[in-house]
Amino acid sequence: MTSALQPQHAAPRSPIRGAAVPAGLAVTAIGILLSLAGAPAAVPSQAAVRVLPEPVVVQAVPEVQVGATTAADPCSEPSVLEAIAVADDAAIIAGFGGGESFRAAVVAGNAPCISLSDPAHVWVVVNKARPLDPVEFAPASLADLPVPMTTRSGQARSDVAAAMGALAADAAAEGAGSIGANNGYRSYDLQVVTHASHVRNSGQAGADASSARAGHSEHQTGLALDVVACDGSCGGIDAFGGTAQGAWVAENAWEYGFIVRYEQVGTGITGYKPEPWHLRYLGPELAAAYHHGGYHTLEEFFALPAAPDYAH
């Protein structure tokens, strides 16, 4: 007898229902895309915004100024050694790299071959604290100064005489007037007489403020001279500073290798009253370094102690 109940089998999967899951996902995805397309863009939160750095401003690289370099040991340079052997001051200074390099090396103690006490060289410094060595020093050779003279002390070193001739010629050519000289080289013995005369007239303190004692005078080196204005006839040294020649010399002397050794601003260092007539020869290179460096005394130029008084 057959049972009225038939065995129950799982109903076959509907093809529509079997594809329902993928279709649902598709519908969902389409909905999302449509909502994104139709809805306004969401504003990102402040924390989500990445702040970009400001662009770097490109600046021009400054030009590198390359100047002359000083040798680590200038005194070992072949050119310096050769110049020292023949006592050529200009070549020695050139071997150091020029006037300013020479000065810098001396001040730094990097020039053991250079003595500021040697009166045979243009860089010698003689003052109230630095007597000449030897004290009765005399230059090896002298030449007549090619300018009008008011005394018989009309000589100087040959390089000084030549430079003075060029200076006087250019001053006249430029309309400044004629320049002569009162004194050039004075020997130790003549300086004894000169200083004694000042002592008689002004007393010891007055003499020491206006005249060097023997052995302490730049005139004894042959590197110094006192100049005067000669318009028709030559005047005295005291009037020189107020003349057209005095103004021209103050402005231009350095171009010929000279400096005005005793200025008003340097009295506390040198111990001498201003002497606009007293020219000291350093040579063109050192005089240019002195001028461009704004110096007013040789003591400052070579970083030496002030010397306003004698030791005794």
Regions from the PLM with identified roles:
Residues 2-183, 188-312:
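Extracytoplasmic cell-surface/polysaccharide-interacting catalytic and binding patches
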